[in-house]
């Protein structure tokens, strides 16, 4: 059964608790990472902490295919992957009319200063660092989806 999709029209006029409840109830997150352990930990974190549906991809190519077919609400993308790295995957996602609107959050162990600015210019919603805290991960994705604490 398909999860209910949220009508985002007027979300900014709703009280914060209602926006958050709608976000929690409707989200499907695509995790693109070549490391199985990271995919599994991130998936378990998002399923447990936020109750979100998770779709997994082990490469940039597979991630682009899944993003187009699954239409996730957000994408968590590893920077360092073989064959097609995170930045290349990001550019292809943003160039595709079916996936350009999806917020992308980068997951990395190494991004510093200039790289973070470069990724922001490429349209990244946020950069998260490994190892990550499950609650922080859920909060960052929530923020990328339009929910802000206290607002």
Q: Where in this protein do the model-derived segments appear?
A:
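Two-component/phosphorelay signaling modules centered on CheY-like receiver
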Residues: 36-55
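Acidic, metal-coordinating helix/loop segments flanking the phosphotransfer/catalytic sites
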Residues: 56-74, 91
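Active-site T/S-Asp motif of two-component receiver
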Residues: 77-78
